[in-house]
Amino acid sequence: MASITNHKSDPLHFVLFPFMAQGHMIPMVDIARLLAQRGLTITIVTTPHNASRFKNVLNRAIESGLPINILHVKLPYQEVGLPEGLENIDCFDSMEHMIPFFKGVNMVEESVQKLFEEMSPRPSCIISDFCLPYTSKVAKKFNIPKILFHGMCCLCLLCMHVLRKNPKILENLKSDKEHFVVPYFPDKIELTRPQVPMDTYVPGELKEFMEDLVEADKTSYGVIVNTFQELEPAYVKDYKETRSGKAWSVGPVALCNKARIDKAERGNKSDIDQDECLKWLDSKEERSVLYVCLGSICNLPLAQLKELGLGLEESTRPFIWVIRGWDKNKQLVEWFSESGFEERIKDRGLLIKGWSPQMLILSHQSVGGFLTHCGWNSTLEGITAGLPLLTWPLFADQFCNEKLVVQVLNSGVRAGVEQPMKWGEEEKIGVLVDKEGVKKAVEELMGESDEANERRRRAKELGELAHKAVEEGGSSHSNITFLLQDIMQLAQSNN
């Protein structure tokens, strides 16, 4: 596509601000590449450590001719009391870092303003993660629109909107176990108070910060969403109406990763050799393997991880189990060794201790299901790969995502988790699904019942729709065009 310009000489220049958490950064880097492929100049503003995680993927994009720049800002470690070098949430070993981290990432406004003054061509638009409310002030100072990126589906965004407009719903609940029906929804969706998305019900110190997020949300020009219209049409339509039409569904953005190496290194370099992993998968029957990954900041206690492992073992299904934070999980390492678990499952199970090449694995013909924490990136990757999902939500938006997959799309099975895994209270919460529950859920997902076969058919159909959405003429491809036309017209009127 020819370069899109905002007047006779300058191309549109979008400046992207990803939040420093893996699940937020990965899709933002994909969005950067998608926009650069349309001829835009792109600048990504982040910290040195986070930039290094995407160095290889972005360098390949730049070498291919895409106009992407990366600028660094330094976090004020000493001012907020953060350990030097702690630049990403998945590096946390304690929730004590959360408040100073949120403060720190929002104290770089002055540095960013200096960067903006030197940028050429002049920035036309900001795309900012919703966790960085300071970018609203930058947008206002330089008189450019700010587009928000939440990293959630439209069902979840609509849920947050409805609950913010109707605060009495949560206030009137008698306990954290009481269910309520989300009003004004196309489907009957029931949640408990702890299951609602994060910024609608936040106890303690984070409340003030969340209020800043809500205010920044209100003043944003629009929202870019990593979903596609055919996946959740009623929710896309209703959420778009709440934003006066300024909501663009452009996903699945992960599909911009076409080369094998880009799929393998999406987000971080893998801790397993790609060829070794693919060779193992090649040895298994088609659609027989369950892929198990509970995200980059999984906080399940040791007792629950043991039950998960034993349930996978007793299911007799081949599986890949990704265990992130392996180096910090000394007790689990000891249990694997001393209990003989690793030895017993070696012919049927593959353990990946660290980061996995998830996109490569999910798209392999031997994989037939995905046990996921329902983080939106993973959920959408599973849907895009045409896989039925076994849902195990942990916190934040993940219970809403489970409702979408199991109830609305009919392409998933619940593991049976009812309670979020609160940081700092993991041991107290303990086991939510025992080994028998794991075994039963795996069999329900991977078995040959009529319901299981119907889920597989539905999942395959959704995967095909996902790929069509990003092709030329597809809904997401067209929505990127509409977004760029909107910003171009705005830039011309400002000029």
From Swiss-Prot:
Belongs to the UDP-glycosyltransferase family. One of its GO terms (biological process) is saponin metabolic process. This is UDP-glycosyltransferase 73C25. The gene is UGT73C25. UDP-alpha-D-glucose binds at residues 23-26, 355-358, 373-381, 397-398. It is an enzyme of class 2 (transferase). Keywords: Glycosyltransferase, Transferase. InterPro entries: UDP_glucos_trans (IPR002213), UDP_glycos_trans_CS (IPR035595). One of its GO terms (molecular function) is glucosyltransferase activity. Its EC number is 2.4.1.-. Pfam families: UDPGT. SUPFAM superfamilies: UDP-Glycosyltransferase/glycogen phosphorylase. It comes from the Eukaryota. Gene3D superfamilies: Glycogen Phosphorylase B. It comes from Barbarea vulgaris. The active site is at H24, D129.
